[in-house]
């Protein structure tokens, strides 16, 4: 037998040099389309454009402010500064911070480590010492909630005393932290805008209002002056910053407001006739067609469609205009009716920075209790389908967030339960009030409506028109207006006289029973202390109700009902390389 045909068996899989090489990370080309630079732009050109786009010099002048009335004139007013960027502008964050540090002289100086004492601010391990008069900069990349709002939560982690917000912003009033807005200077081709504008609005006498997002609003004044001679009824919306807010805008000065009634949607209307100023602002807006530069977020777009006669959006990148389709208001009307038959409401907090958030939560909670419903407050960060799906016993969600991007509009029916706004929930709780077609998302407007309703109720009580005597009969049955089915848990906090559970004080013979029997009585009851227990009713509909429930047999098997559930035993403890029984075996 020859050995020529024999093959040595492989003791391992085939390996070559590529097996032991590190995986190569493909470098990504950063696309900065908002800067308007060619793809082959040099680093110097990019830095120069960034300084012009974000007004780096004006930001430095703003940060160079000193504390007034202090003994030392060199103490900076803002020592801990956080820079907040949206995802689309995070690519410029490192360059912006480097330019700010270079111009403000914030580069740390290095000293001999032997002369440095260990402390909280400086450590001998690094040998770097921060001057007590210097400033510190942090980058906030991942916002806690909506990117258009000031992120006070993330800024509080570094004890920030100023937040500089870059990009588009909602300009809503912040709770406490000072803020500054830097919108940037995006390029806008006015010729393309004018061409599309004239094609859509052939009638020169039409009442038209021009609006844009915060960065493109800086170009509206120039566009307005060009189109005004041909369109006499033309107006535009400039930015409006509430004087009560501790915020400022860097690089742009909005036009002053002509009248307080023209301040709406965080904008001030410019160019209206003097006769229209005395008219109700809602009536004025309904008479105008809106031409909006840049496509707003879905909540903002839905809000605009309810305030104007028609809405046209213009996309600056593509240069095309669109008149729909837009989010439908009928779905909001349907969700409002579903909220009327809901028994458990989940208040979903989607912001922690806006003013009056806590006040709105407390007042809405009180309204829910008065309506005989239950509510729970949830703070889960950025909401998504998976997070909200964990709470099955919630019948409907009420989201409290920014009116620009903080309101959840479920266009694709991804969420398992309907999501409404505070305004829609208040309409559902007050059955005597009909929906006029408006869609209100402003916190202050909702609080004003609640205050007016409370005043009317007090006036009715004083006039004696309110009857405080309770009817002896049960309340009228509640039906779901969408499905038509009877709903028995729409008001779980209402007083019941036909369903209740006995306590040990009322029946002392329960003391002789076992603790397990008492638990079973409470778990099977649907009413506790004269109110419906939605948790107990939801638990009864589940197949798995806890440990040992999978050992229970059918109700017809009397012997099986008396059997105990699974016994709880000590499990395996330790880590994978050495559990308890492994150690005992090793030492034996």
UniProtKB/Swiss-Prot annotation:
Signal peptide: none annotated. Residues 579-588 have a biased composition (Basic and acidic residues). Residues 466-477 have a biased composition (Acidic residues). Pathway: Protein modification; peptidyl-diphthamide biosynthesis. Keywords: Cytoplasm, Iron, Iron-sulfur, Metal-binding. Its cofactor is [4Fe-4S] cluster. One of its GO terms (molecular function) is metal ion binding. One of its GO terms (cellular component) is 2-(3-amino-3-carboxypropyl)histidine synthase complex. Gene3D superfamilies: Diphthamide synthesis DPH1/DPH2 domain 1, Diphthamide synthesis DPH1/DPH2 domain 3. InterPro entries: DHP2, DPH1/DPH2, DPH1/DPH2_1, DPH1/DPH2_3. Binds 1 [4Fe-4S] cluster per subunit. The cluster facilitates the reduction of the catalytic iron-sulfur cluster in the DPH1 subunit. Its main location: cytoplasm. Residues 454-485, 546-588 are annotated as: Disordered. It comes from the Eukaryota. [4Fe-4S] cluster binds at residues 149, 170, 402. It is found in: Cytoplasm. GO terms for biological process: protein histidyl modification to diphthamide. Component of the 2-(3-amino-3-carboxypropyl)histidine synthase complex composed of DPH1, DPH2, DPH3 and a NADH-dependent reductase, predominantly CBR1. Belongs to the DPH1/DPH2 family. DPH2 subfamily. Required for the first step of diphthamide biosynthesis, a post-translational modification of histidine which occurs in elongation factor 2. DPH1 and DPH2 transfer a 3-amino-3-carboxypropyl (ACP) group from S-adenosyl-L-methionine (SAM) to a histidine residue, the reaction is assisted by a reduction system comprising DPH3 and a NADH-dependent reductase, predominantly CBR1. Facilitates the reduction of the catalytic iron-sulfur cluster found in the DPH1 subunit. PANTHER family: 2-(3-AMINO-3-CARBOXYPROPYL)HISTIDINE SYNTHASE SUBUNIT 2, DIPHTHAMIDE BIOSYNTHESIS PROTEIN. This is 2-(3-amino-3-carboxypropyl)histidine synthase subunit 2. It comes from Debaryomyces hansenii (strain ATCC 36239 / CBS 767 / BCRC 21394 / JCM 1990 / NBRC 0083 / IGC 2968). The lineage of its organism: Eukaryota, Fungi, Dikarya, Ascomycota, Saccharomycotina. The gene is DPH2.
